[in-house]
Amino acid sequence: MSDLIRRTAVELAAMIAAREVSAEEVTRAHLDRIAAVDPAVHAFLYVDADGALTAARAVDARLAAGERLGPLAGVPLALKDVFTTRGMPTTCGSKILEGWIPPYDATVVQKIRDAGIVILGKTNMDEFAMGSSTENSAFGPTRNPWDLSRIPGGSSGGSAAAVAAFEAPLAIGTDTGGSIRQPAAVTGIVGTKPTYGGVSRYGLVAFSSSLDQAGPFARTVLDAAYLHAAIAGHDPRDATSIDAPVPDVVAAARNGDVRGLRIGVVRELDGDGYDPGVRHQFHQAVKLLADLGADVGEVSCPHFEYALAAYYLIAPSECSSNLARFDAMRYGLRLGDDGTRTAEDVMALTRAAGFGAEVKRRIMLGTYALSSGYYEAYYGSAQKVRTLIIQDFAAAFEKFDVLISPTTPTTAFPLGERVDDPLKMYLADLDTIPVNLAGNAAMSVPIGCSPDDGLPVGLQIMAPVLADDRLYRVGAALEAAYRERTGRLLIEDVPDPAANQEGAA
C-alpha cells in the first residue's frame, strides 16, 4: 500500500505545495487504491480517472508557475452522486437517472474545482438519499471496510466507505436526517452536517428541501474543517443560503481546547434500545470531556422523542413534491414512448420501473400526508412538532454551548438485516434527526470501538445555528485525547479490504 494514501489531506496538501510530491502522483496512488479495493467495497459508481489526472496536472502546472493555491489544492476527493457534475454522470443511485450527464456543476462542485481539489469520481448512495444503509442503491450495496458483511451507513455510505477504505482522504456527502453523521459513525471517520443554509444546495438533487445539507467527510477533524471551509459560504443561486460570515472552523479545529466549555448530555438520546457497547463508549467519552476541563451536565429535550415521527411525515411530503419532476419528459429514463401511448402512460411506466421500492414508499407516504383530508392531521402536526424541537434546542443552548449524544443507537448492522423492516431501518437515525429538523450544526467523531463487536462508535456534537466552529473545537479535543491514549487514530485499525474480502461475494 502506498504511503501517500495513509496521509491526511492537510499533510498531502503541504507536500504538494512544497513540491515534495506531485498532485498527479497523489492522484495516481488513490486511483490505484480504488482499483485494488473497490471491487470489494463498491464505494464508487463512477471513477473519472482521466478527469482526475487532468485536474491534478493542472495543479502541478500552476504550482510550477509560482501560483499560490488553496490549502487543499491537489488533494483527491470522492463526491456523492447526488450533485450535478458537468462531464460526469449524476444518477442519485437511481435507474431513472442512469446515464444522465448534467450540463452544469453544482455550486459545491464548482467550489471544489476552484480550490484545486481533485475529484476522483462519484460515490454510491441510497436512491435519492432515502435510506440508512446504502442498500437502496439501484446499483448494488456498498460494504463497510471494517467488516464487508455489514452496512457502511447511509445514505452517503459510498462517500464514508471511500474515506474509511483509504480510497480518498476527503469526501462530500449530504445529510437530510443523519446521512453524513450516521455513516461517519459506523465507519470510524469524521462527518459534519453544517448549519442549514451554510453550504449551497444549488445543484444538489433535492430529497427534502428544508432538511438537505451538504457537508464533509474526512479521517481527521482538521481535514474536515478545511473541506468545510472550502465549500461553505453564501450563494445567491440558493434561496435558502445564509448570507453571513462562515465560522472559522479551521481555527477551532486547531484549537481543540474544551476547558470551560459547557457541554450538555441529552437525556432523551440514551437508554433503552441502545447497544450496551455504544453506551459504554459514549459514557467513557463524556467522562473524558469532563477530565479535559469541560463543564458537563445533563439536559432534557422532551420533544425529541417525537422527532422521528415528525421527520417521516415532513421529509416524504417534500420528497413527493420534489420527485414529481422526474417525469420522463426532459431527461433521464423514458419507457414506452413508441407513439402508441399518452404522455401520462409513458410517465407512469417510467416511474414504475425507474424508482425503487423505498422511493415509492416515501412518495406514497408524502402524498398521503399532503392530501386534503389529512394535511393538518399529519403534515401540519409534524411542523408543529418541528417548532417544539427548535424550542427545545433554544432552551438547551441557553444553558450549554454544545450538546452531545451517541451518533447512532447501534454499530453497523449486517447487510440485509433491516431491508424488509422499514421501521427498524428508520431507527438508525434516531439520534441525528432532531438536528435536521432544527437546522443546527452537528458532527460525528469516532470515540473507539464497541467492546461487544469491535466496530466503530461515534459521538455526536450539536451546536447552535452558525456556531459550527464549536463542533470542531470539541471534535478536535476528543480526537487528540484518543490519539494520546492509543498512539493513533481509530481509522488506522481498519482492516484492509483488499486482503479481507470474506463476505463480499
Swiss-Prot record:
BP-aspect Gene Ontology terms: translation
GO CC annotations on file: glutamyl-tRNA(Gln) amidotransferase complex
Name of this protein: Glutamyl-tRNA(Gln) amidotransferase subunit A
Catalytic function, reaction form: L-glutamyl-tRNA(Gln) + L-glutamine + ATP + H2O = L-glutaminyl-tRNA(Gln) + L-glutamate + ADP + phosphate + H(+)
Catalytic residue list: K80, S155, S179
Gene that this polypeptide is encoded by: gatA
Top class in the EC scheme: ligase
Presence of the UniProt keyword Protein biosynthesis in the record: yes
Classification via HAMAP family: GatA
Family listed: Belongs to the amidase family. GatA subfamily.
Function: Allows the formation of correctly charged Gln-tRNA(Gln) through the transamidation of misacylated Glu-tRNA(Gln) in organisms which lack glutaminyl-tRNA synthetase. The reaction takes place in the presence of glutamine and ATP through an activated gamma-phospho-Glu-tRNA(Gln).
GO molecular function, one term: ATP binding
Record bears the keyword Lipid metabolism: no
Subunit structure: Heterotrimer of A, B and C subunits.
SUPFAM superfamilies linked: Amidase signature (AS) enzymes
Taxonomic lineage from the root: Bacteria, Bacillati, Actinomycetota, Actinomycetes, Acidothermales
EC number: 6.3.5.7
